């Protein structure tokens, strides 16, 4: 394909300082902000209106460039409290971002503007393009392998960038969980943010949850802490023996990036053992996919994925609809679920699987993000469900 401008300003004649080069040869020009450099990644689009800082620091976006459909990004600035990456010094999350327009901040919590923050977090950004036209392209052709490049002088070797985009192998068969996981165990006690108080600390522990970190988000941990849990976050490569020695009352399988089939090589044998031990299990996103793989189901790469804070999901048990936050490019093939696994939730956009539970076992998972951050809180009840399974497990264990 030929070079494409997709500029949001049709009269602009400025020399482009950033490019997005797709593997199909499409070249999109715009203004560069944030980090300077070149990186290969998969381009997806996110339809959330708010929460750009939380989105960009979600480790599940590792290896991806996010095209924001909402036109103005940066309005509320950035701060040190809204980061979702558990280890922000390593800057796990999206490697690139695309905005129609970046705005000056106007918010009492802001301590940096978007450009400064992007530089610090090593995220390359392309601005001044028609992001909805790019979204239409992704919807038609699917998530695209690409290169995003930023040079303040506007010097680019387009042929070389096209070659890099075409040679990048993409997210299939890529285990990114091992790249973003914690390097050592962490004790977590921070609870959700409260107006005029900030984040509070949980000092009363009623039970112990071990959270396996495949790329976990902070707000997931906060909501479990709010239930009175002592939480130990462990690296993804922690052995079954080490986890069982911690005597958990429940085990959480976290969200994370990459191809679940690649992470499954070491994760699935562990999860199978936990299922056999009847320890309560709760999985979110990648954790959901890994639980499904552990019971013999299959996962597949999606055409464009689901990324946004406005995705309707039907609870097949209650017949209620939840508006959810989603971020995944792989999905569980519901036709591959064994008979002893019940499908509990489906997407109302495309009927893809969004939840399962193992019949006769205290184990369940969802594809979407009930913790939101950003997004609606319709699905917070799932943390209470996990809590109730743990309480029942403790009662049975003490008999």
Curated annotation (Swiss-Prot):
Q: Which residues of this protein are catalytic? A: 285 (nucleophile), 369, 371
InterPro entries assigned to the protein according to its UniProt record, in alphabetical order: Anth_synth/Amidotransfase, CarbamoylP_synth_ssu, CarbamoylP_synth_ssu_N, CarbP_synth_ssu_N_sf, Class_I_gatase-like, CPSase_GATase1, GATASE
* Record flagged with keyword Transcription regulation: no
The protein's GO terms of the molecular function aspect are: ATP binding; carbamoyl-phosphate synthase (glutamine-hydrolyzing) activity; glutaminase activity
Q: Where is this region: CPSase?
A: 1-204
Q: Which residues form the Glutamine amidotransferase type-1 domain?
A: 208-396
Pathways per UniProt: Amino-acid biosynthesis; L-arginine biosynthesis; carbamoyl phosphate from bicarbonate: step 1/1; Pyrimidine metabolism; UMP biosynthesis via de novo pathway; (S)-dihydroorotate from bicarbonate: step 1/3
Q: Where does L-glutamine bind?
A: 60, 256, 258, 286, 289, 327, 329-330
Q: Which SUPFAM superfamilies match?
A: Carbamoyl phosphate synthetase, small subunit N-terminal domain (SSF52021), Class I glutamine amidotransferase-like (SSF52317)
Q: Which SMART domains would you find in this protein's record?
A: CPSase_sm_chain
Catalysis: reaction(s): hydrogencarbonate + L-glutamine + 2 ATP + H2O = carbamoyl phosphate + L-glutamate + 2 ADP + phosphate + 2 H(+)
Pfam families the record matches = CPSase_sm_chain, GATase
The EC number(s) given in the record are 6.3.5.5
Please tell me whether the keyword RNA-binding is annotated for this protein. no
The UniProt keyword set, sorted, is: Amino-acid biosynthesis, Arginine biosynthesis, ATP-binding, Glutamine amidotransferase, Ligase, Nucleotide-binding, Pyrimidine biosynthesis
Q: Which CDD domains match?
A: GATase1_CPSase
Q: Where do transmembrane segments lie in this chain?
A: none
Q: Which GO terms describe its biological process?
A: 'de novo' pyrimidine nucleobase biosynthetic process; 'de novo' UMP biosynthetic process; glutamine metabolic process; L-arginine biosynthetic process
Instruction: Indicate the family of this protein.
Output: Belongs to the CarA family.
What the protein does comes down to: Small subunit of the glutamine-dependent carbamoyl phosphate synthetase (CPSase). CPSase catalyzes the formation of carbamoyl phosphate from the ammonia moiety of glutamine, carbonate, and phosphate donated by ATP, constituting the first step of 2 biosynthetic pathways, one leading to arginine and/or urea and the other to pyrimidine nucleotides. The small subunit (glutamine amidotransferase) binds and cleaves glutamine to supply the large subunit with the substrate ammonia.
Subunit structure, interactors included: Composed of two chains; the small (or glutamine) chain promotes the hydrolysis of glutamine to ammonia, which is used by the large (or ammonia) chain to synthesize carbamoyl phosphate. Tetramer of heterodimers (alpha,beta)4.
NCBIfam families under this entry?
CPSaseIIsmall (TIGR01368), PRK12838.1 (NF009475)
Q: What is this protein called?
A: Carbamoyl phosphate synthase small chain
Please give the organism: Bartonella bacilliformis (strain ATCC 35685 / KC583 / Herrer 020/F12,63)
């Amino acid at each position: 394909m030929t070079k494409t401008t997709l500029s949001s300003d049709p009269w602009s004649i400025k020399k482009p300082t950033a490019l997005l080069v797709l593997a199909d040869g499409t070249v999109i020009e715009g203004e560069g902000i944030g980090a300077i450099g070149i990186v290969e990644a998969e381009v997806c689009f996110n339809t959330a209106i708010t929460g750009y800082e939380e989105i960009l620091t979600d480790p599940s976006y590792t290896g991806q460039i996010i095209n924001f459909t909402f036109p103005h990004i940066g309005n509320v600035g950035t701060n040190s409290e809204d980061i979702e990456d558990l280890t922000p010094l390593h800057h796990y999350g999206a490697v690139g971002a695309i905005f129609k327009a970046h705005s000056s901040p106007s918010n009492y919590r802001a301590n940096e503007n978007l450009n400064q923050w992007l530089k610090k977090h090593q995220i390359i950004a392309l601005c001044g393009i028609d992001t909805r036209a790019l979204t239409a392209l992704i919807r038609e052709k699917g998530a695209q392998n690409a290169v995003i490049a930023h040079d303040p002088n506007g010097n680019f070797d387009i042929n070389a960038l096209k070659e890099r985009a075409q040679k990048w192998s993409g997210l299939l068969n890529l285990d990114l969980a091992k790249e973003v996981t914690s390097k050592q165990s962490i004790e977590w006690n921070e609870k959700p943010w409260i107006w005029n108080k900030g984040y509070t600390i949980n000092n009363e522990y009623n039970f112990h949850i071990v959270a396996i970190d495949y790329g976990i988000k902070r707000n997931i941990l906060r909501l479990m802490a709010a239930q009175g849990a002592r939480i130990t976050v462990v690296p993804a490569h922690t052995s079954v023996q080490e986890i069982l020695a911690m005597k958990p009352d429940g085990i959480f399988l976290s969200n994370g990036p990459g191809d679940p089939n690649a992470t499954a090589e070491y994760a699935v044998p562990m999860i199978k053992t936990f299922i056999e031990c009847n320890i309560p299990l709760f999985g979110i996103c990648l954790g959901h996919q890994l639980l499904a793989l552990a019971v013999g189901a299959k996962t597949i790469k999606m055409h464009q994925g689901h990324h946004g804070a406005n995705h309707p999901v039907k609870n097949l048990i209650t017949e209620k609809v939840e508006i959810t936050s989603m971020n995944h490019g792989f999905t569980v093939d519901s036709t591959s679920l064994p008979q002893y696994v019940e499908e509990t939730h489906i997407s109302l956009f495309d009927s893809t699987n969004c939840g399962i539970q193992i019949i006769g076992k205290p184990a369940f998972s969802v594809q979407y993000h009930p913790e939101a951050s950003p997004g609606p809180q319709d699905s917070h009840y799932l943390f209470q469900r996990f809590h109730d399974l743990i309480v029942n497990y403790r009662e049975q264990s003490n008999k």
